Structures are given as C-alpha cells and as structure tokens.
Amino acid sequence: MEGFEKVTVYGVSFDVASKQPIVLLKVEGRNRFLPIWIGHPEAAAILMKLQNAELPRPMTHDLLAAAIEQLSASVERVLVTELRDNTFYAVLQLDASGQEIRLDSRPSDAIALAVRTDAPIFASTELLNANGIEFEQEVEDVEDIVKEFREFLDEVSPQDF
C-alpha cells in the first residue's frame, strides 16, 4: 500500500513511568518500531490472543470478530494513520460482500481485532518517520525498546517537532 508499511505486533510491555501498557509494532523486514500507549483492557485483549489463552466466554473483541463474520464480512486490514494531539488514530477496513467499509478506530481496538482475524496491520510511513524508533542492531527484548523510547521522550522538546 502506498504511503504505508506493513507492521506486526512485536509485543506488549508496560511503561513504568506512565503506568500505561504499550503495544509495540515492528516494521516488517526492518529494525524499526512504533510504540503506542494503550489502555489496560486493550492490552489484556491483545496479550490474551497472542498467548492463545482460552476463555470460557468471549471478550468484547472476540464478540466483534464473530459479529463481523456472521454478517458475511471480513476485516481486510488495519491502518494506523496518524498521531494528532497526543492521540493515535487508526482505520479499520472491512469488506462486506465486496463493499469496502472504513471505520474510525482506536489503534488498540483495531489491533486487538486484527490479531483475532489475522488481518494485516499497516502504519503510515509519515507516522513511522516522525514517531518510530530505529535500532542499528537486532533487538531481543521488548523492554529495551520501551527504555530507548522513554529516553528519547525525556530528551525531546515540543520545539523539536
């Protein structure tokens, strides 16, 4: 997709300073990451699916995925589009009998749905250029990425943007 790069969910971590979970998206084929601060329920929803946890009852995102399927639609892709006023934005792109439907979404909800439906996730190249973190060598630990990004945030000022 022009203007977008394919990303995968690299992991979910916890930012000790802000006491918030972070989902880390990794650009496919590169050592570039996009950290997105998310809520605790969405972090749990993403982690449970990534860890193949079996639950006795469906969670909200499981219910939404089942409803989309029962309506003969499918999640085609998730687009993480921008960061505006400290808020990330995403678009959930559905296919309903050949009709494209685009829904405004929080990235955390869209990602939680994507991991349940195996839908590809894409991030805007512009967003990645402005907010991504690139490592020269392969990173093994999610915590290293969070630490590196926290250090970047501590050193940056609004004038840098």
Residue ranges, per PLM feature:
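Divalent-cation
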Residues: M1-F161
